[in-house]
Amino acid sequence: MKEINIIDFGLMGKQISALFYLLGYEIDVYNKSKLNIYEFEKQIKLLQRKIDFSNFNAGKINIYQHIEDLKNSLTIESLNEDLNLKKEIMQILRDNNIVFSNSSSLSMDDLNCDFIHFFNTIYIKLIELCGSNLERFTPLKDLKKLGFHIICSKGNRGALANLLLFNEISSFFKIIEKYDY
């Protein structure tokens, strides 16, 4: 069975974990606090309604509260956008794992690792990749089978979709200001 580590079980961590679980991976999730597995099950059901996983068999999930217990494996970091916390976790993981960050606001230079950014919600089927060792992200083949679109970017700060979103938000506030809402 293919294996992948997911660091943190927040908004994106749950979605990424459910996606790879449904793709048949053994998911090793690290989260400091105890997980609500019901939230994971809800995410699985939602993804099954949105994406056809009929060509895949469900995987397995293991949950760890100590990062040292994770297996040496491909790892996706999906922590909150806290640079110091991300750096601390990356330092622990980097020796024995291939680590990709799902950060949407930091740059590759900030974390010194490659990025794989899944968009929220994950069933949008859009992934932004940036880095110099992208061939090490072996699940791309499975994601492409599901119809995910892969964008390779230069790794500027913030994901491409976030840059579009910030522009929309800025336009929204300009309209409010202009028309005195």
Where do the protein language model's features map onto the residues?
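Active-site-lining helix/loop region of Rossmann-like oxidoreductase modules
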Residues: 151, 159-181
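Rossmann-fold dinucleotide-binding core
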Residues: 79, 98-163
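Amphipathic alpha-helical segments at domain termini/boundaries
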Residues: 17, 56-74, 143-147, 152-158
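Short glycine/serine/threonine-rich phosphate/pyrophosphate-binding segments
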Residues: 13-15, 84-87, 106-108
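Rossmann-like NAD(P)-binding element
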Residues: 32-35, 49-94, 98
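NAD(P)+-binding Rossmann beta1-loop-alpha1 motif at the extreme N-terminus of oxidoreductases
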Residues: 1-54, 62
